[in-house]
Amino acid sequence: MFNRSNTAGGSQAMKEGLGINKLSPISSNSNPSSLTSSNYEKYLQLATEKNPCMILELELDGKVRYGSPQWNTITGVADDSGSSPTYIADLILGSDQDKGVFQKATDMLLMNDDTSCTITFKIKAADYEGSAGCDDESTITTLEARGILIRDGHTQLPSHTMWIVKPRTNDWSDFYANEDAQDDMVIQLSDNCDDIDIQLPEEFAKTLGFGAKIFVQYLKRIRLEMIIDEFNLPLPKMELCRVCENFVPVWWLETHSQSCVCEHRTESLIQLLHDNLLEQQAILANFTKDSEYKGSQIQVRSNNFLNQVLDSLRELCQDAIDINPSEMVPDLYHSLSTFPQDNGNNNNNNNNNNNNNNALLDQFPIQKDTVSLNSYFQFSPRTNHNIQNVTSWQSRFFLNDDQDPGLALLIHDTLDLARKKVDAVLRLDNAMTYSLKIKNEVNNYVVQLIREQIEINKHAILTHPMNLRSSSIFHSPLPQIHSQQPEAENLIYSSSTPLQVQHDQCASFEAPSKSHLEPIPFPVSSIEETPTANDIRHPSPLPRSCSNTVMKLPTPRRKLDSNGLFSDAYLNADIIPNPSIESTISIDRDNNTNSRGSSMKQYGIGEATDSRTSNSERPSSSSSRLGIRSRSITPRQKIEYSHVDNDDRTNEMLSRDKDSLQPQPSVDTTITSSTQATTTGTKTNSNNSTNSVLPKLMTSISLTPRRGSPSFGNLASHSMQQTNSFKLIHDKSPISSPFTFSKDFLTPEQHPSNIARTDSINNAMLTSPNMPLSPLLLATNQTVKSPTPSIKDYDILKPISKGAYGSVYLARKKLTGDYFAIKVLRKSDMIAKNQVTNVKSERAIMMVQSDKPYVARLFASFQNKDNLFLVMEYLPGGDLATLIKMMGYLPDQWAKQYLTEIVVGVNDMHQNGIIHHDLKPENLLIDNAGHVKLTDFGLSRAGLIRRHKFVPHKSSLSISSTLPIDNPANNFTMNNNNSNHSQLSTPDSFTSDHKQYNRSKKSSLGQQYEHSEYSSTSNSHSMTPTPSTNTVVYPSYYRGKDRSHGSSNIDLPASLRRSESQLSFSLLDISRSSTPPLANPTNSNANNIMRRKSLTENKSFSNDLLSSDAIAATNTNINSNNNISLSPAPSDLALFYPDDSKQNKKFFGTPDYLAPETIEGKGEDNKQCDWWSVGCIFFELLLGYPPFHAETPDAVFKKILSGVIQWPEFKNEEEEREFLTPEAKDLIEKLLVVDPAKRLGAKGIQEIKDHPYFKNVDWDHVYDEEASFVPTIDNPEDTDYFDLRGAELQDFGDDIENDNANILFGKHGINTDVSELSAANLSPPLNHKNILSRKLSMSNTTNRSSNNSNSSVHDFGAHTPVNKLSIASVLESVPQETGYITPNGTGTTTTSAKNSPNLKNLSLAIPPHMRDRRSSKLNDSQTEFGSFNFRNLSALDKANKDAINRLKSEHFSEQPGVHRRTSSASLMGSSSDGSVSTPGSNASNTTSGGKLKIHKPTISGSPSTFGTFPKTFLRSDSFSTRSYSPERSISIDSSTLSRKGSIIGDNQQTTANSSDSPTMTKFKSPLSPANTTTVSSYFSRQRVLSKSFSQRTNSSDLSAEESDRLQAISRVNSLRNRRRSGRKSSSTSEIGYHMDVLVCEPIPIHRYRVTKDLENLGCTVVSVGAGDELVSRATSGVSFDLIMTALKLPKLGAIDIVQLLKQTNGANSTTPIVAITNYFQEAATSRVFDDVLEKPVKLDELKKLVAKYALKKSQEDEEHTILSDSDETH
C-alpha cells in the first residue's frame, strides 16, 4: 500500500497514523455454516472499519478546504482554522509540474465535469518518532486521489473539488528502485498457492499492464508442469478482439485494444473523407458558371478563368482520391542480419554467441520476419507523389471572398477535404508503425521469458532429479533480462511505446546472450522541440522527446484498485493521434535507403535520419530516484484538423523513422478539442538534444467517465452473460473493416470460404496467421485488418417481417453469437423507386444517433452486388402497431409512458436538426425492457415531398446521372468488372480506361421502370406492376388485419376500419414512400436526381452531435450531396388539392399521420409536422384507430385538412373517462391543430412538457422508469411479437468481390495456373484449431456446419496431439477454418477441402507478377449508395473493455481467500433446451396465470386490473440478445473450453412460436406494486468486491491488520451467499429482510433509533456518525444493500459525498442511497438520492422503504442463485 522502501518503523508509524490497529486474526478454518448472526455483524464491522481512505476538499485554486483526520495525521497539517491556508501544491514533492498536478486536474474537471479524475502524487509524511530529520525515501508516501467537481447547489457554479485519497495500492511502479539499479529492475510476483516467484522485466510489465499478471500465471504453469520441451508448451488462453476480430492472448488484449480501436477509427475517418472527396469530384465534374455552391452564386465573368480553377481543383481532388494508406513491406536486407543465427546486433559492436541448438527461428526460417522488427510500412510511389501534391498545393488564383464567395468556398472546401485525408492517412501510418513496434517488442520478451523458464526447468531436473518440486527449484528466479551495457544512458519507458533510447544519451538494449532474441534497439531521432500552449492542450498518448533523466511516460498501469473497473490508461486511450500533414517522416534502415525513405525525402515530406545510440555516462541526481513519472491521459476527444501553415506543423504522434518512435511529452494536459499548433520541429544532433528534454514527473493524472457513461455504466447486470453457440475459429469475412488497405498475409487455405477476398501476399518471406496460437505471437498482425462486414458473417435464422423493398431477418453473428436484426434492401428496387437518398439518410442518421437511448442502434452496414444490409439492434418486443392490434387500445398508464418517451426522442432529434417526417406506430419499436425506440429515418431531414413526387427540370438532372461514361474527365471510379488485379485506389496500377464511372446501371434501371405503374391489392403484399393505375399502397409488416378488429369494445363505424390494402407497411422498412415513375420519357435519368440531393437544404447537424471528426465526416457526407443546386426547387409540392376533382396525383404509403402542411407542400422543413404525428399516435394508443382514418388516401387528406377529429361515440361522460381523461383529450386537441403556428409545441418543447397531462412526469429520467409492459422473451430467437407478412428466407447473393474470385484462384479458390506448385514439400502446420477440435469432440453434441458452400466437415481430433504446442510451430502459417463451440463445451470444426499441407504456402509460390495487390476499399466501385461500409466502433470498443473487465474479475476470483460463486455464465440460465426459467419454483404458474383477458378489458388505470405478474429477469441491460455485451466470453481457454451457461442448449428444441401473429399471452402488465422493481447491478458490485479483495490479498507487504480485514470481507461474502440461499427457500411471509445497511447520522439518538428499527426489521446495520467514516466504510470493498445518511453532516455535505460515491467506480457506486432529513425539499431537488425520508422516521415508513429495496435485492438474489447453480452444474 505504501512504498516498499519504507522502513519497518516508518511503516508501522504510518499504520498507526492511519488508525490501523492490530486485530485478532480470524481463524481461516472456521466453519461458515456455524456462524451466527452476531458473527456476521462482527465480520461486517471488521470488513469495513479502518479503511485507509481519506476525504480531501480543495478550493478551485488548490487551497485545502477540508481534510480528514487521517490526512492531517499523514501530512502533519494541523486542523486549525486560524492558521494560514494550506495549498496542496506545497505538500507535493517533485517539480513545479508535479506540484501543479491537482490544478491541472481541476482544469480538466472544469472543462468536463462528467468525468472523475484520478491522480497519483508523492508527499513527505509527517515526522514520526525516530525519523525526525530523515530525508530519505522512507518518509515519502505515494498517494492516489480520485475526485470530482462539486457545484454550488443554488448557483450551479463550480464550487470546489472533492477527493477520495488513499495510499496507492501495490503497483508495478511500487517496485521501482532508484536510477542506479534501473538496469537490474525486475518485478516480483508471488502466488499465494505455491509461492512461486516470477520476475518480469520492468518495461515488459509496464507494456502489458494488467496482462503481466496473467502472463506470470502462464509462466508459473510452465514451471509447475516442468515443461522442458518447446513442443509441449500448454495452450494459452485466447480472447477475441471485437474490433479487429482476431484472437489474441488474454495478457495482450488490453494493450492491443488501445491501438486497435485507434487504428480502426482512423480508418473509418479515411473512408468517410474519401467518400466526401468522390462527392466533391462529382460536383466539380458538372460545375458551370450558372451553378450555385451551398447557396452562393458563382460570380466570375470569364468562363476560361472558371475552367482553369475547376481543372486545378479536379486535379487536386483526383490526387487526394488516389492516396492510399501505407502497406507493410519487409526489409529483406536487414531481416537476414537481425536473426539469432547472425550472432549480433546491428546497432552495436557486441556479438552474442549462439549456443542454443533449439533456437526458435533456426527451425522455421520461413517465419523469421514474423518477429523481425525490420518490417515497416511504406507508401506507394504514386501515393507519395500525391501526398506531396496535396500538401504543397497552392491556388494560382487569387480570389477575394467578397468578390466571389461561392467559388472561394468551393476552393476552400475541396482543399480542406484533400488535406484532411492526407492528414488521416499519415496518422494511420503512424499508428500502425507504433503498434507494430510494440507488438514485436512484446513478442521478443515473451520468447525470451518462456525459453528462460524452460532452461530453468531443464537445469532444475539436472540438479534436482529426485525432487523436481522442491522449493529450491521453484524459488529460483528467472535470469534477469537486462542491458549488457551497465553504462547505458537512461531508458525511456512507456506503457504504450517500445524501448527507446536517446541519441548519445540512451543505451541500446540487449537481451541476455543465451536467449538470442534481443529486443531490437529503437534509436530516437533528435528533434529539438519547445512545448507550446497548444502542445499542452493537445496531449498525445505517445511521448515526444527524451529526457535527461529517466522519463516514464505514462506511468505503468497499476494494479486495479478497488474502485476501478478498467485501467485509467485504457479508459482514456480513445484519442486518435493527430499528426500534421508536414510531419517529420524519417526512415532508418541502417543506412539502407529504401524507396519510401528516398521518395519522402524527395518530396520534402520528411528526411531519413540516422540517430544510432552511443554509450555515455549515466547522470545521477537525487530527484531522479523519486516517484512515479507523469501520465496525463485525457478522455475521448474530437479529431480536429490543423489549418496552420505547413511550416508551423510538426508531428504530434510519431517520428516517421520506422525504427524509432519519438517520445512526446504527454504532461501538462488539458482537455480540449481544438487542433494542435506546435512549434517547428528542428532537426538537431545529439549534442543539442538535451535542450528540449523535460523533467521527469512524480505525479500522474487520468480521467474516468462518471457512472452512467458508456465506459462502465450498467456493467453489473452484464456480468453473467455468455454466448450460446459461436464459432471458435471463424469464417473470415472480407479482408478488412471498414475497408481494406493492407495486405492480407494469409495463405489461401486460411480463408477457405472467402478466398476471393484474400489478396496474395507481396512478401515471399512474410506470413502471419490471423489468429495467434501461442504466447509467442502476442499481437495479431496489425496489417491483417478486421474483415469487411459481409452477410456471410451471419447465420440468418428466420424472417421477421417483409416490406416493400426487402425484408428484415433475425440473424446471429457466427463469430460471437450476438443476435441482430438485419434489414435487407434490394438495390434495384431502391434505385427504381428513387429511394437512394432515403437509404443514405437513414444510415447516416442512425450512425450519428447510435448512442441515443431512443434510437434503434445501428451496428454495421454493408452491401453486395444485389442488396444493402443494415445490421441493427434486435428489439424483440415488436412495434406499437402490433401492440395496439393485439390489445385493441392501451391503458392510459401505458400510453403515457410511450408518449413521454416519444416526446423526449422527437425533441432531441429536433435539437439536433433532424425532422423525422414519418412518425407512426409502425416506426416505434419496443425493446426488451419495454421502452420505445425510434427507427426508420428514411424520410428524415430531406423531407417527404421532394423525394415523393419531385419531377426535376431537365437542367437539374442528377450530377451522377449526367456524367458520360466515356468522358475521361469524369473517370474517377473504377468499373466493377476491372477490380480484381489492380489496386483500386492506385492510379499507377491501372490505366484510365479502367476507371470508368459506372452509371449505366442507373440509366438502364431508370428506363426499365419509366413506363411502369404500380398497384397493390389486398391479397398481395408485394408490388405488382400494372398499367392500370399509378397508385401503390404498401401493406404493414405487422398488421395482418384491421387494427380495429382487435379486442376494443368501442363500436367503431365501418368508415373507421381499415381495409387490408390501406394498411401502412412496416417501420422496419427504410421508407414508407417512394417516388412514382416519372411521366416524361425523355428524361430517362431524371429519376436519379435525388441520389445526389442532400438530406436537407442549408441545414446541418448541431455540433453537440459531432463528438469526433468521424461523425463530422459523416455529417459532411450527409450534406455534401447538396453542395450544388442547379435549379430552383419546384414550387408545386402539394400532395392533394381538395378542389381538383380531376387530379391524377396519387399517394402511396401511410397518409394517416401526415400533417396538413405536409399535404399542402409547405411543411418540409417545419418540425411542427412531427408534433402533429405525435398527436395522431397518442390518439391511436388510447382509442385504437387513427383520428383521420378513411378508406382512401384522398378521403384521409380531406379529413386532415379539415382538422375534424373523429372522436368515438360514448354513452356517457363516465364511459368516456374510462378511455380518455380530460387532460389527454385536451392534449390531443392541442396537438392536432391545423395551423402549425398555433399547434402545441410551436413555442418550444416546454409548453408540451408543461401540459397538465404530463404532471408529475420526471422528464430527466423517462427511460429510467419501469416500463408498464415488458415483453416476455422465452428464447433469444423469439420473434412472436412480429408478423412474418409472407417473408421467407432467401439467397442474398455473392459479395461484390466474389464476382472476380476465380480470376486468380479458379473455381475452388486455387490458382489453376500454378497448381503444380502445390506439390512442394512443405511441412504441415500444427493446427491450433484442430487441438481445440479434439478437445471439444470429447463431448457428444450435434455437429453444426457453417454457412459456407465451399466447406466440408472434418474431424481433425485424431491428427493432432492434445494440449501440446511448440514455440516454433506457432510461427508457421495457420489455416483459417470455421468452427463452433456448442453450449456444453463441445464443438466441431469446419474447414475447407483445400486445407492441405501441400497448399500451406501456396500463395508464397505465386510469382510476384501474378499476385494481386491488395485492393483498397477506398476506391471500390462507388455505387449510388457509396461505400456503405460502417461498423459501430464505439460498441466494439465497449465490448473489448467489458471483456477486459471480465478477465480481471475472473483473475481476481481465482485468488485464494476470495469466495465467489458467480462467473461469466449466461443470464439465460442453464436449461439445455434454451428456454428461460422465471426465478422461483413457481415460475411456470406465474407465467401462465398472467394472461390478460384482452377480449374484456376494463381500462380504468388501476394496477390491479391487469394482474400481478412478475417480470422476467431479461432486462435490457442483461438480456442475451444485447449485442456486444461484456459477458460474451469469446475466449479460448486451454483449461476450460466448455461454454458455461450458454444461452441456448445444443438441442435447441424450444424455438420461437412459428405463428405469424404474436401470441396473446405475450402481453402482460406487471402493474402490481409487488412487481414494479428493477434489476439493479448486483453482479457489478460483486465483481468490484471480488476485485478489491484480490488486489489487497496479492500485496506481498500486506499487513496483518489488513489481512484480517480482507478475511472478514471474504467471510461476509460467504455468509451473504448462505443467507441468500436460505432466503430462496424461505417462506414469503418471513419478516426479516436480511439487508446490509450503512447508516450515517451525526445525532446519536437518531442514529440509535434508526439502527434499532432496521435491526428489528432483520437488517444488519453498520452505523457511523461522520461523513469521513461514511466514505471510509462505503469504499472498503464491501457492497451494502442500502445506504442511509443524514443530509446535513459536520464539515462535509451529504450531497457531495453521494455524488462522489456514485460517480466513481466503487463497490457501492450503484447502491441505493436514501436521505434522512428535515429538509425534504432540498434533498428531493438535489436528484442524487434514490429516496428521501423525512424526520422523524416512523417505523411504518422505514419498513416500506426497506421492503421496497429488499424486493429488488430479492429478485437479484434469485437471478444470482440460478446462475450460480448453473455454473456449478457445469
From Swiss-Prot:
Biological processes per GO annotation: cellular response to heat; cellular response to hydrogen peroxide; cellular response to nitrogen starvation; cellular response to oxidative stress; intracellular signal transduction; meiotic cell cycle; phosphorelay signal transduction system; positive regulation of autophagy
Annotated residues for binding of ATP: 800-808, 823
Protein localization: Cytoplasm; Nucleus
Main localisation: cytoplasm
Phosphothreonine PTM positions: 704, 747, 1075
Regulation of protein activity: Kinase activity is inhibited by phosphorylation by cAMP-dependent protein kinase (PKA).
Reactions listed under catalytic activity: L-seryl-[protein] + ATP = O-phospho-L-seryl-[protein] + ADP + H(+); L-threonyl-[protein] + ATP = O-phospho-L-threonyl-[protein] + ADP + H(+)
Boundaries of every Response regulatory domain copy: 1636-1750
Region (Disordered): 334-358, 530-563, 583-694, 970-1032, 1378-1403, 1448-1507, 1519-1572
Similarity comment text for this entry: Belongs to the protein kinase superfamily. Ser/Thr protein kinase family.
This protein's name: Serine/threonine-protein kinase RIM15
